[in-house]
Regions:
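Short hydrophobic beta-strand element within catalytic cores of glycosyltransferases
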Residues: 316-320
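Membrane-proximal helix-turn-helix segments that form the acceptor-binding/catalytic region
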Residues: 140-174
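Short His-centered aromatic/hydrophobic patch
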Residues: 88-95, 120-123
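N-terminal strand-loop element at the rim of the active site
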Residues: 6-13, 19-20, 26-66, 181, ...
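Conserved acidic donor-binding segment of nucleotide-sugar-dependent glycosyltransferases
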Residues: 321, 331-333, 337-345, 353-359
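A conserved mid-protein helix/loop that constitutes part of the nucleotide-sugar donor-binding site
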Residues: 17-22, 217, 226-241, 258-264
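A short, well-ordered alpha-helix in the C-terminal region of glycosyltransferases
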Residues: 360-375, 384-387
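Aromatic "clamp/platform" in nucleotide-sugar-dependent glycosyltransferases that forms part
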Residues: 280, 299
């Protein structure tokens, strides 16, 4: 069977791109032919070193998405590679509008168009949950958005709904990352529940896990350094209340992004001890192997693989209940901790408790975390994708 992934830009750093590589490699491993089509020119990215050499990477020839050259090229890609299934990895309205037009033209001429799957990689309501953070700042646009917030909320709702409806129109199936997202996806896209299926992200189990029982007194954040949605300043402020009490512990912040300067300034101005900015990395497992706790303070997430990858290495996850899929990942008090959203004091208290546990108790939770992560072994996840392919073909 021949599979085509569509991404807006590939390669580039990001969770969607990383998961595309992981799934592509797993499909190739079990005999599928895989192509990845980038609609716009990508950037150099270390992730590419992990992509199986059998995966064919393609690009649209023209930067103008709707150009005749691009339309012809896309249909040629389908024909030459005998594509059976398209996996669309974005919710962009214009992209899906183009796909719907091409699908209509092909089917209108009595020809076969591949099965079309769109993957929703976030909480469908993320734009509403993060609205207040999105309109913070001193810029004129943000000031106007705050002044006209009720109107802006309606505008955002209409933009998001329009994108979901367009995705639903072009898709034979829509994939969300958790069963808890099915109803919200159906509400926004106005489609039947039967059209939506939940398949989680997965990870490869090939890497060796070392040092489970070592004394690893480190808290870890891995991800984009951007305040909108991620709210890393919240984690830094939480650490501010603990760093003097736990001088033998460190907070490692791994990643890069537009707000890294803000976070470094916050650490410096507040004189917060033992915070280390490690920059971006293509080997987060190095940091997982060093750490005891993996932290998130996001105001919304989709299905954060950073928690599951950390659990694989024996890191105990702690995060806010700001996304419904958290219950798929963490069993509170068993293999990690889930804190009510925006309850910073509870987050601080739970971290203090966790950092004070004896080695036996820590190892018990770490082992539980490892066992839970095994549910998301890519070998199990790819089986769910195979079932979906067979249903559509």
């Amino acid at each position: 069977m021949n599979i085509l992934f569509i991404l807006k830009q590939f390669p580039r750093y990001g969770g969607v791109e990383k998961m595309t590589i992981t799934l592509s490699n797993s499909l190739v491993k079990i005999g599928y032919n895989v192509c990845i089509l980038s609609l716009f020119k990508g950037n150099k990215c270390e992730y590419m070193s992990r992509l199986d050499s059998k995966v064919v990477c393609l690009n649209m020839p023209n930067e103008k998405l709707f150009s005749r050259e691009n339309r012809r090229h896309f249909l040629l890609v389908l024909q030459e590679n005998e594509i059976d299934v398209i996996i669309n990895q974005n919710m962009d309205y214009e992209v899906n509008k183009l796909m719907l037009k091409l699908k209509g033209n092909v089917q209108g001429n009595g020809k076969y168009f591949p099965a079309f799957i769109t993957v929703v990689h976030n909480d469908p309501f993320v734009d509403f949950k993060c609205l207040d953070t999105m309109i913070k700042g001193r810029g004129v646009k943000n000031v106007l958005k705050r002044m006209l917030k009720p109107i802006y909320q309606v505008y955002i709702h209409n933009v998001v709904r329009r994108s979901y409806i367009m995705a639903s129109l072009v898709s034979d199936k829509m994939v969300v990352l958790s069963k808890s997202y099915v109803s919200s996806c159906a509400e926004l896209s106005r489609c039947e529940y039967e059209k939506i299926i939940a398949i989680p992200n997965g990870f490869n189990v090939d890497d060796k896990v070392d040092g489970l029982f070592l004394n690893r007194k480190k808290l870890l954040y891995v991800g984009r350094l951007v305040e909108t949605q991620k709210k890393i300043s919240e984690l830094i402020n939480i650490w501010k209340y603990l760093c003097e009490e736990f001088l033998d512990w460190d907070l490692l912040i791994v990643g890069d992004g537009p707000d890294v300067g803000i976070y470094k300034s916050l650490v410096k101005s507040e004189n917060i001890k033992n915070v280390y900015f490690e920059g971006s990395t293509n080997s987060p497992e190095y940091y997982f192997n060093q750490s005891t706790v993996v932290c998130l303070t996001s105001e919304s997430e989709g299905f954060p693989m950073v928690l599951i990858e950390g659990m694989k290495y024996g890191c105990i996850p702690i995060c806010y209940d700001s996304f419904s899929a958290v219950d798929d990942i963490i069993d509170d008090g068993v293999n990690g901790y889930v804190i009510p959203f925006n309850k910073q004091n509870e987050y601080i208290c739970k971290l203090r408790y966790l950092m004070s546990l004896d080695d036996t108790s820590l190892c018990y939770m770490r082992n539980n975390a490892i066992k839970k992560s095994e549910l998301y072994d890519m070998n199990k996840v790819v089986f769910e994708w195979e079932k979906l392919f067979n249903e559509l073909i």
